[in-house]
Amino acid sequence: MLRGARSHLSASVALAAVLAAALLSSFARCSLPGRGDPVASVLSPYFGTKTRYEDVNPWLLGDPVAPRRDPELLAGTCTPVQLVALIRHGTRYPTTKQIRKLRQLQGLLQTRESVDGGSRVAAALDQWPLWYDDWMDGQLVEKGRQDMRQLALRLAALFPDLFCRENYGRLRLITSSKHRCVDSSAAFLQGLWQHYHPGLPPPDVSDMECDPPRVNDKLMRFFDHCEKFLTEVERNATALYHVEAFKTGPEMQTVLKKVAATLQVPVNNLNADLIQVAFFTCSFDLAIQGVHSPWCDVFDVDDAKVLEYLNDLKQYWKRSYGYAINSRSSCNLFQDIFLHLDKAVEQKQRSQPVSSSVILQFGHAETLLPLLSLMGYFKDKEPLTAYNFEEQVHREFRSGHIVPYASNLIFVLYHCEDAQTPQEKFQIQMLLNEKVLPLAHSQKTVALYEDLKNHYQDILQSCQTSKECNLPKVNITSDEL
């Protein structure tokens, strides 16, 4: 009976997915502006963590599978011997929480009184169906699978020695348990299959020559396993004070009034959360289907900058420099990366083949941001607060430019045969979103491997996740009892 119920549920979900895809396809065929629409393009830089990868790397709009070799990449007598990549999942559906807020907003529109000669945007939204459903809940979309397949093709072309056919069986893949990450890892493998076997359909991941992706949430979702983070940040009602304060601040109030006028609803019926989900709906429609939604017409660039800052405040205080535990909770992941690199160095020194030339780890924006913060990247002189929006217009910390969908942080270890000293034989570069990332401490584009380890010595040797994440014990004296 239970099996039959499950089969019926699966069939219903599958049918809903097909209908949703067909509905979206019909939207795209209607006389709607496409990806090159000017309004969508001017808002795109401000979508925060809901940003398309190609908006960070515009050259991909021309040819999404052609690699772009950064001129700063090492070449000549230095040969890449290992690549360790931390990859965010591809484009996804909104979460159930976001979908329910959108339904609430649509309900407000349906109950408003129509006004003759009223807002063109409000009229367009009246005709725009709400196609999101609860079952979608953050799952990877087909565009997200495409993100991963194309990234695989580009990396394989950029580092042919590492992604050679002989190394395929020795690939190591780690993933978060979330479906969007598991599915992203599978799509990446399909892209590699396409690289090795052009024109042939890929088999199931379980039938490929390499080992299937292995779930490891202690690495990819370290924040869920850090009691200090969970208590002091995740479950702490005051931890995101600056986020909540900005929601009621003058910048957001200006946006609220403008949006209320555009939608023809009382301003008291709106709040910052509803406004933000409307803005994200513009980004979802663009990212998932490449269509220009009427939700995009609700906002202008000034509104977008305010809403981007609201999103960045949350990322800053919950995942980055706002609290030390945000980044210190990622020490285990950072150390794991260097364990792989150390092993490769040791094997090369012994004239042995590198056992794992490519290690791929699939996680979340919440995986990447703390790690980059731990390494000292994108840190502004002044913290982001609810009260310095104007001063932070040119800030370094813009989450959409750092961790869009499919974002990736790559460590490339090189063996330099003609090095003058033993220390120079092993050098390292980092790439963020396929562009060489200058070292945070020196701004150089390449480092001796030992020098980089020395710079991060405290993290590699002294940062123990068990100690970092333990809550301080509260001593209760007999007087207090």
Swiss-Prot record:
Residue positions with a glycan: N236, N475
Major place of residence: endoplasmic reticulum
Signal sequence region: 1-30
Active site: H89
Alphabetical GO biological process terms: intracellular monoatomic cation homeostasis; phosphatidylinositol-mediated signaling
Enzyme nomenclature, EC number: 3.1.3.62, 3.1.3.80
Reactions catalysed, as given in the entry: 1D-myo-inositol hexakisphosphate + H2O = 1D-myo-inositol 1,2,4,5,6-pentakisphosphate + phosphate; 1D-myo-inositol 1,2,4,5,6-pentakisphosphate + H2O = 1D-myo-inositol 1,2,5,6-tetrakisphosphate + phosphate; 1D-myo-inositol 1,2,5,6-tetrakisphosphate + H2O = 1D-myo-inositol 1,2,6-trisphosphate + phosphate; 1D-myo-inositol 1,2,6-trisphosphate + H2O = 1D-myo-inositol 1,2-bisphosphate + phosphate
Motif Prevents secretion from ER boundaries: 478-481
Function (record text): Multiple inositol polyphosphate phosphatase that hydrolyzes 1D-myo-inositol 1,3,4,5,6-pentakisphosphate (InsP5[2OH]) and 1D-myo-inositol hexakisphosphate (InsP6) to a range of less phosphorylated inositol phosphates. This regulates the availability of these various small molecule second messengers and metal chelators which control many aspects of cell physiology. Has a weak in vitro activity towards 1D-myo-inositol 1,4,5-trisphosphate which is unlikely to be physiologically relevant.
Name of the featured protein: Multiple inositol polyphosphate phosphatase 1
Organism: Rattus norvegicus (Rat)
Gene: Minpp1
